[in-house]
Amino acid sequence: GMAQHPQVIGAMVDVAARMGTGAGGTRNIAGTNHPLVELERELADLHGKEAALLFTSGYVSNQTGIPTIAKLLPNCLILSDALNHNSMIEGVRQAGCEKQVWRHNDVAHLEELLKAADPERPKLIIFESLYSMDGDIAPIHAICDLADKYGAMTYVDEVHAVGMYGPRGGGVTERDGAADRVDVIEGTLAKA
């Protein structure tokens, strides 16, 4: 793989010589560094977003990102696709708010749940763009149409699609021209 490519190894050696091999602690303790900030800018640009935030893994980003967003929205209702990854399910558990599970990629069922919810209640729809276990691709535009109609936020896990889909590798949201419609795009630097 790319981890053994001579140019990748050379770039790593160069950066290690200039910057060191680690911060010695997490960002909140040891601070940040210029290459990390630059990488976040590049990732935000890749997805057409205002900003990006790096985590230690895709699992951790879902596990902490979902509950953080939900806790910022008082009385949030999370609507989760039935086949979401365990990291997303764990994030929903940690959010501690009400959740409803919609049948996999079934936008009619999702709409039933949205229609039954209090229109004033904050809602977060979470789903994957490309499901790893069966290769299904989410109907992103249809989900975003429902989010617009019912005033919900959208959170898509692009872990299995980043680097593989879209002209710049931004994932299924980029390929389908939907990145600007999704509120939060979660990805990884390790899968594709």
How does the language model describe each region?
Residues 66-86:
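Conserved PLP-anchoring active-site segment centered on the Schiff-base-forming lysine
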